[in-house]
């Protein structure tokens, strides 16, 4: 992926990984547009990094996604990189009957949102030089967190979708999968300071070094995520599943 001179859209750019990526890509000489639901959060990121632009987007609303895509192309016709970063994660007990509002919202944001936005932008991207599509998935797409089963399932689906997009768009749009480990962000309550999670700055440092490799790897997988990424292929899936879920429950209990 070209490192500078791009026009980059980052969804979920008002905080966490999205905001941190936006700052780094601006520093490399790209024009970056961050998008998200919360105008105040977007404004705060732009205030810290004046080279950014911001646009509100309700990724869950199909009509809003189509309207956003039309406005985005009209205002930023050079758009050639899209980073699907917006995501939500909810803890749930799938072993008992429960309200599915959180599950449905997770699917809408994490899976349907990227599908709709890519559909709205794909014809434009195919016409751009050095076009790239980046999906932010998760280590949990390869070994699920049982207490976040729907989140894990959406990330597994996004991995599969990324593989399909890469094959379908070969020669026209570079498709890259970014696979975070557990990172200190506001994704879940207490996560931003949870011991044992990867500090955000360290994660972004490693990610940007991988993006800079030529050719850019098809999968941006930092060292911490690789044991989960390869667990099934290496015959370690069952033991990794148990260890991951035991550690996650202990970490959440310690933070309460």
Where are the language model's segments positioned?
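Conserved mid-core segment of classical short-chain dehydrogenase/reductases
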Residues: 66, 89-104, 147-150
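The beta1-alpha1 cofactor-binding region of Rossmann-like NAD(H)/NADP(H)-dependent oxidoreductases
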Residues: 56-68, 100
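SDR active-site lid
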Residues: 160, 164-224, 234
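Active-site helix of classical SDR
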Residues: 118, 154
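Conserved glycine-rich Rossmann-like NAD(P)H-binding loop of the short-chain dehydrogenase/reductase
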Residues: 28-44
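Conserved glycine-rich cofactor-binding loop
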Residues: 12-16
């Amino acid at each position: 992926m070209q490192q500078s001179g791009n026009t980059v859209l980052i969804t979920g750019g008002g905080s966490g990984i999205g905001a941190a990526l936006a700052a780094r890509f601006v520093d490399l000489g790209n024009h970056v547009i961050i998008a998200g639901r919360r105008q105040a959060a977007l404004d705060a990121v732009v205030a810290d990094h004046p080279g950014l632009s911001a646009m509100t987007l309700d990724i869950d609303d199909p009509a809003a996604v189509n309207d956003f895509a039309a406005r985005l192309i009209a205002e930023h016709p050079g758009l050639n990189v899209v980073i699907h970063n917006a995501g939500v994660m909810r803890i749930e007990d799938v072993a008992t009957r429960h309200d599915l509002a959180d599950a449905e919202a997770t699917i809408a944001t994490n899976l349907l949102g990227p599908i709709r936005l890519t559909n709205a932008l794909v014809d434009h991207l195919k016409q751009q030089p050095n076009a790239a599509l980046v999906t932010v998935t998760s280590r949990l797409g390869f070994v699920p967190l049982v207490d976040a089963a729907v989140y894990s399932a959406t990330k597994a689906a996004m991995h599969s979708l990324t593989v399909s997009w890469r094959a379908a768009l070969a020669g026209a749009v570079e498709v890259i999968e970014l696979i975070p480990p557990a990172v200190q962000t506001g994704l879940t309550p207490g996560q931003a300071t949870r011991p044992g999670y990867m500090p955000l700055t360290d994660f972004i440092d490693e990610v940007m070094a991988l993006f800079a490799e030529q050719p850019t790897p098809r999968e941006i997988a930092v060292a911490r995520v690789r044991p989960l990424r390869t667990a099934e292929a290496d015959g370690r899936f069952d033991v990794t599943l148990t260890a991951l879920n035991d550690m996650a429950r202990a970490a959440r209990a310690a933070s309460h």
